[in-house]
Amino acid sequence: YVDTKIAGQEVRIGGAYGYLLPEDWKDGSEQRFLKAFVQTDRLKILLSHVPEGLLLWKSMEYWDVDLVFSGHVHGGQVRVPFVGGLFDPEEGFFPAYTRGMFSCGNGTMILSAGLGSSRGIPRVNNLPEIVVCDIVR
């Protein structure tokens, strides 16, 4: 992670790939990273490739992170009009978390549908998305 100042605001920005569970998972490196990452009064912004641990398994309630940007689920890859995403490997059919803004613990997650596709599966009814946010604290 890096500590910086943006428009006069003290900010800590970091990134992680995995599920970000509170208990040791794999080699415990994610937990060591997050324990150090949250030890600040700065605005904490985390880039997390995988949203499921933070949203489905509620680990964002454990980690004191203000804002998370995530992707990984590609907006559900295939979207059913007026319904939403068709499938996510973690949630199954008609998943709740495919894109959007979600309150989690004491923070917020912005889940982007992104630009790419997964494993060569074409995007259907699912426009590519780049998220632009104004952060006001």
Residue ranges and their predicted role:
Residues 51-131:
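Conserved beta-sheet core of the metallophosphoesterase superfamily
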Residues 3-48, 52-58, 120-123, 128:
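Binuclear metal-dependent hydrolase catalytic cores centered on His/Asp/Glu-rich metal-binding motifs
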Residues 1-8, 100-105:
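Short acidic-hydrophobic surface loop/beta-edge motif
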Residues 133-137:
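Short beta-strand-to-coil "C-cap" segments at the C-terminal boundary of structured domains/repeats
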